[in-house]
């Protein structure tokens, strides 16, 4: 039986290697394979000065260097020996290669690293990669640079209980929590502490859907400062993983919209973020 793969974009930085180590941990527990991808861009040169030939030579040299870096990575990351993996490289942006891999392989999830506030800005607001997160049909796990390797014992799910057409959207999270024997805190942030009839009905449906894993419900009354409320909850309840659903006009857009506090989202670069596909 062909195993689904966990896709890991890697640039050989400490940040991406940390994300890789988290992906290895997940792959071992879920019995999955890893697919490592590296993207590179060849400098543009003028054709009239032999640019085509020069670009070919530069690309070949870059591929040789990347091949050497992959071999060095395998030697310096002994954890890789515990899982099946393959690696590939390609010319283009990282998001281009992610799209291609999602088309060509059976991908379970994407695991990617981020360099603090700058990195989360590049990942979530960059024109290409942000569109990957918003439109991909697999979960994306973002690992902050200083997060270390997590066992994800305590997971927080932010939910507004609205516009959820299919509860299967939560299945990747349930599988993740079941694998790590984790507890899920389902948090509803609201401007008041009362749920509407629609929200109560959806909460009951979610309750039934989550019966396989340990979970609890929490309603938090906040005004407009959702980011402080989430950060406080994470710190007070020792949350290892924050889970969100990217839909228009919900808390995800409040946090990641152009005019929001995106650059502070990493919460001191310690809390991984799981984004579920819609």
What is each model feature region?
Residues 119-124, 252-256:
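Glycine/threonine-rich flexible loop motifs
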Residues 1-53, 154-220, 239-241, 268, ...:
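Small/aliphatic-rich secondary-structure junction motif
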Residues 54-68:
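A short acidic, glycine-rich active-site loop
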Residues 1, 22, 75-110, 212-262, ...:
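Structural beta-alpha unit
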Residues 3, 106-108, 129, 138, ...:
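Local beta-strand N-terminus motif with an aromatic residue
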Residues 111-114, 140-145, 245, 273-278:
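Short beta-strand elements of ligand-binding domains
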